[in-house]
């Protein structure tokens, strides 16, 4: 998919760069594969803000995407490619030979009419699913499982992928986009190919209103707040905060490591922080 630029008829149009979605299906999603989605506005069940600067935006319908691909050795044909407001990647509607339909993440170079298959040993082509232990070294994959049978968790965003770089007994070594290398069990599955819509990184929203359509509210800095609202707040006139940058809850920001899951550290061979100078 290419990028679209617009004639500068307004200030917002002048800056706007969008992904050309003309090749995607223009109708509504399959009703049986959708769910209603409640707009939480960044609040949790007690009504308190847990994610700041969220709210408003266009009403969305959730598309149920199959991250597990448990229909083994049953071919499916790609019926159409669709836009999904809940994620940056595009999704594909597939129809199995038994007549059931499902949505999957659309990989790059997947076209309408292609056949995809999940199994222990399948062809290495975009959209096919197989255990990591059965893939050749160097394979580009996405939607990678971390726990056997849980469904894909890694490399699901637009344009992302992971690469199989080695084997270690029952495990394989996977290199992620961040530079991290980690061990994943060979029986965990992954989908072959990179995720669709790689041009997502090059879009320009163009105007504040388009951010509001996406449900993003203005992000205001701590130094502009009052002391009751933020550790950086207060002061006479404009101040620089007067302390090392912290979150509204007083925890150091700007890159301090917060990972505390020590039990899974053994699976990380090369940290993503190692490549930062």
UniProtKB/Swiss-Prot annotation:
PROSITE patterns: RIBOSOMAL_L2. One of the primary rRNA binding proteins. Required for association of the 30S and 50S subunits to form the 70S ribosome, for tRNA binding and peptide bond formation. It has been suggested to have peptidyltransferase activity; this is somewhat controversial. Makes several contacts with the 16S rRNA in the 70S ribosome. Transmembrane segments: none annotated. It holds the Pfam family Ribosomal_L2. The lineage of its organism: Bacteria, Pseudomonadati, Pseudomonadota, Alphaproteobacteria, Hyphomicrobiales. Keywords: Ribonucleoprotein, Ribosomal protein, RNA-binding, rRNA-binding. The keyword Ribonucleoprotein applies. Gene3D superfamilies: 2.30.30.30, Nucleic acid-binding proteins, Ribosomal protein L2, domain 3. This is Large ribosomal subunit protein uL2. One of its GO terms (molecular function) is rRNA binding. GO terms for cellular component: large ribosomal subunit. Belongs to the universal ribosomal protein uL2 family. One of its GO terms (biological process) is cytoplasmic translation. The keyword rRNA-binding applies. Residues 222-277 are annotated as: Disordered. Part of the 50S ribosomal subunit. Forms a bridge to the 30S subunit in the 70S ribosome.
